[in-house]
Amino acid sequence: LNGDVRNLKVNKSGELVASDAKQLQHFRSRLSMVFQHFNLWQHMTVLENLIEAPIRVFGMSKAEATERARQYLAKVGLQNAEDKYPSSMSGGQQQRVAIARALTMEPEVILFDEPTSALDPELVGEVLKVMRALAEEGRTMVIVTHEMGFAREVSNHLIFFHKSMIEV
């Protein structure tokens, strides 16, 4: 992960798998993912969405998780949204909350699955602006997107899929 070599083995079906469960859990704790449809918990406020994983996964105190969450909400331009519920927000705002949630885990790599495809066209720019800022910070991101201009602008390596084939 991000230059760190992990021990892998080949299972009976020929797939590469982690050699042990602890290694796999450690690997997963260093990744965050932002989904196409945000995957925010609708019954929780924005702040509650952001502090849940750091508390459960890392055993972080609520105060520390809250401080971290507020820092990342400010980074995505939503510092005044912590008491809102996702259903009261635009798609672009929800996606920025999802990005802030990913950042609260302070991952080495962030995976983005079509982060703008479920958004109205006028909301795409606000999400791309946040992602551009992350790229400028030097964050490692793997992005699946149809926003080709954006991908060319922020990437140092592109892989194209065309007719289910990889084109480098």
Ranges and model annotations:
Residues 104-108:
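A short, proline-enriched helix->beta-strand linker immediately N-terminal to the Walker B motif
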Residues 145-146:
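H-loop/switch region of ABC-family ATPase nucleotide-binding domains
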Residues 4, 8, 15, 62-80:
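Conserved ABC ATPase "signature" region
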Residues 121-123:
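Helix N-cap at the start of a conserved alpha-helix in ABC-type nucleotide-binding domains
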Residues 158-168:
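H-loop (His-switch) and adjacent beta-strand-loop-beta switch element
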Residues 85-89, 93:
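Conserved ABC ATPase signature
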Residues 110-113:
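Catalytic Walker B motif of ABC-type/P-loop ATPase nucleotide-binding domains
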